[in-house]
Structure formats: structure tokens, C-alpha cells
Design a protein with these regions (language model features):
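A short beta-loop-alpha structural element at the N-terminal edge
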Residues: 4-19
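Conserved GNAT-fold acetyl-CoA-binding loop/helix
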Residues: 22-46
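Conserved beta-hairpin
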Residues: 52-70
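Conserved acyl-donor/pantetheine-binding loop and adjacent beta-alpha core of acyl/acetyltransferases
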Residues: 66-93, 101, 152
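Conserved acetyl-CoA-binding loop-helix of GNAT-fold acetyltransferases
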Residues: 96, 102-115, 135-139
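Conserved beta-strand-loop-alpha-helix junction that forms the acyl-donor binding cleft
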Residues: 101, 123-134, 150-153
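Conserved GNAT acetyl-CoA-binding A-motif
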Residues: 110, 116-128
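Conserved acetyl-CoA-binding loop of GNAT-fold acetyltransferases
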Residues: 138-147
């Protein structure tokens, strides 16, 4: 086996991305978190490829994880955090197959994106009832800047500023 490599996703990756994201959604649902259920399908993944830079973590030809980096905030941000500062970049769909979680692959994907943004700001949001993920973002240098209700869940808005490190 070769070491995992990060590369831009392409159209040929759509089916594998849909499978990965839904596998992660079902895994989270088994842990009591349903916020990703019925979110990712072929159309939504294709839309992400058009609107964002989607990166995949591949080992040989298998996609183990993914992350999307874009310049537009999610539709629900304005309702959830109307007074929140605007960021230069937004990170979404950070996902690693359940059998590869807790092995540092999510951190590798996140660090890749942080390296791409340079001195710019990056925001992401996370549901409040996923403490491991909240701690992961905090340990990665993100600061909580707001909280609110979005898509029916209590959510935190996190921001990364390179100068704050």
C-alpha cells in the first residue's frame, strides 16, 4: 500500500464521494447524530464540485476521506448567525470513512486546507452535540465565534485566523 495522498476530486470521484459521505452519515446516525442524513446525493456532490474545491484523501485508488473548501457560506449561516463576521473561506463536508477515523486523516485534510488559505480567514460550523468534533476544531486552532440554531440543530460557528496562532 502507498501512503495516502490528497488531490482535487474529479467527476469520476462522484459515486465514491456519495458513498463515503453517506457511510459517514449513517455512522453518525448510529451515534445519535442525524444532521447529515439525506444531505448528500449525486446532485449535491456534483454541485459541490462546481462551486468548491473538493479534496479527496486517496490510498491507491480508494477514497478514504474528503473535504470541501469554498468562498460562499452555507445558506443557513445568515439565519443562524446574522451578526457573525464574514470569512474569506468556508470549510464543509470534512469526512473520513469510519474504519479510518481516529488515525489522523481528518487532521491531514484540515491542515491541507489551512495551508491553502495562507493568512485568510476560514469558518466552519459544527453541531453542539458532537463534543469530540468540537474539541478537534479547538485543538486545531479554531475559535468559537458564534452559536445558534441552524437546520434544526444547535450549532457553533468556528473561525481560524492564522495570526491568532
Amino acid at each position: 500500500m502507498t501512503d495516502p495522498k490528497i488531490q482535487l476530486a474529479c467527476w469520476q470521484d462522484v459515486d465514491a464521494l456519495v458513498s463515503l459521505l453517506n457511510t459517514c452519515a449513517n455512522h453518525m446516525h448510529q451515534q445519535g447524530m442525524s444532521h447529515w442524513l439525506d444531505v448528500y446525493n449525486e446532485q449535491s456532490v456534483r454541485q459541490n464540485l462546481l462551486q468548491k474545491s473538493v479534496y479527496v484523501l486517496k490510498q491507491d485508488s480508494m477514497i478514504m476521506g474528503c473535504v470541501a473548501l469554498g468562498i460562499q457560506q452555507a445558506d443557513y449561516y445568515e439565519d443562524c448567525w446574522p451578526l457573525a463576521p464574514v470569512a474569506d473561506f468556508y470549510l464543509t463536508q470534512l469526512a473520513v470513512l469510519p474504519e479510518y477515523q481516529q488515525a489522523g486523516y481528518g487532521r491531514i485534510l484540515l491542515q491541507h486546507c489551512l495551508g491553502l488559505i495562507g493568512q485568510h480567514t476560514l469558518q466552519l460550523d459544527a453541531v453542539a452535540h458532537y463534543p469530540e468534533l468540537l474539541n478537534f476544531y479547538r485543538k486545531s486552532g479554531f475559535k468559537q465565534v458564534a452559536q445558534g440554531i441552524g437546520l434544526g440543530d444547535h450549532r457553533y460557528l468556528f473561525e481560524y485566523r492564522a495570526s491568532a496562532q
